[in-house]
């Protein structure tokens, strides 16, 4: 009987303490649109099951991928390394940032530009020497980038409040802490182009570089920011109500954008968004008790008008899931991820 009393006492003391203890977030209400059905262009298929898993078991969380002129594959991993996969499959360390490298892209001089969530915007030369380009604009979560023909780097800061390990808190708080910025290597100046984005993520320039796309992961949408023409300096909705959380996006500079969706929409999360009090309570729980993403592999091909021209799936997520980035190179798609131990390669 004493154990029953002890349990009741624990409940009497513990529950009010949990309820009234300060929450790590101050969440806002948000009523998401109903998730689209997976029909038409979104119809599931098994295309991603043909993906070859490179360096399986030898890398962890290579979030973004790029390939150099010699066909060597680069990715930034959870332990702060930029790994390089040689043609024979050998994995070596190209550089160590000491942070969490996320988006990366080669410039025209062969330098690897890296968005490091902790260190800012970095440049790494062919010898692996690291130079910090920008830590300005009070960013704490540098995320993804693309580079135009003049060398200007367009990049995102996902959140100016939450660091990379706290991305689920940013999701639940549902407030616009993200920014979209540019860095000019000639003047070494950083400019904030857009504020008030809901987890600013993937960045991709159009074929003619007249506009750039920016993913808002936690609003299931893509924003178009105009760089040239009458609309230069303005932005508009490019695509809305996606079937999952948009992460990385890239352009093949031939009119096609490749969009990575690491997780499908989650009805529990969508329903919680209308109940800020419950979100604040959940945010007090350990990370392993928070809602989990359903394993699913999904990559979308988009044209420059925002139409889905192709979708690639692994519907049961057994072979490949959690795709965070996708890059087209020499007839293949290369795919990265946040928490898996491979680099994906799929022949087009």
Q: Which residues fall in each region the model found?
A:
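Sequence-structural signature of mature extracellular/luminal beta-sheet repeat domains
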Residues: 1-348
């Amino acid at each position: 009987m004493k154990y029953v009393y002890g349990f009741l006492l624990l409940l009497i003391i513990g529950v009010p303490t949990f309820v009234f203890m300060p929450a790590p977030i101050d969440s806002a209400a948000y009523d998401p649109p109903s998730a689209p059905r997976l029909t038409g262009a979104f119809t599931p298929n098994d295309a991603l099951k043909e993906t070859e898993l490179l360096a399986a078991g030898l890398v962890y969380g290579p979030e973004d991928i790029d390939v150099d002129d010699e066909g060597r594959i680069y990715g930034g991993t959870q332990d702060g390394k930029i790994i390089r996969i040689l043609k024979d499959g050998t994995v070596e360390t190209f550089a160590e940032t000491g942070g969490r490298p996320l988006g990366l892209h080669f410039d025209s001089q062969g330098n690897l530009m890296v968005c490091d969530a902790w260190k800012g915007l970095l440049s790494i030369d062919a010898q692996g020497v690291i130079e910090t380009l920008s830590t300005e604009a009070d960013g704490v979560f540098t995320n993804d980038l693309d580079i135009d023909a003049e060398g200007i780097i367009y990049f995102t800061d996902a959140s100016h409040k939450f660091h990379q390990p706290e991305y689920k808190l940013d999701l639940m708080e549902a407030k616009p802490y993200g920014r979209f910025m540019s860095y000019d290597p000639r003047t070494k100046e950083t400019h904030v182009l857009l504020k008030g984005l809901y987890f600013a993520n993937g960045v991709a320039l159009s074929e003619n570089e007249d506009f750039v796309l920016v993913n808002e992961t936690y609003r299931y949408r893509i924003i178009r920011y105009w760089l040239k023409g009458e609309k230069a300096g303005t932005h508009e909705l490019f695509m809305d109500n996606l079937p999952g959380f948009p992460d990385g996006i890239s352009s093949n500079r031939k009119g096609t954008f490749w969009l990575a969706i690491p997780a499908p929409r989650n009805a529990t999360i969508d329903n919680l968004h209308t109940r800020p009090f419950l979100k604040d309570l959940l945010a007090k729980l350990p990370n392993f008790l928070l809602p989990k993403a359903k394993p699913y592999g999904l990559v979308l091909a988009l044209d420059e008008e925002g139409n889905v021209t192709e979708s690639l799936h692994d519907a049961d997520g057994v072979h490949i899931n959690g795709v965070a980035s996708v890059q087209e190179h020499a007839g293949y798609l290369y795919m990265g991820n946040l928490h898996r131990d491979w680099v994906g390669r799929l022949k087009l």
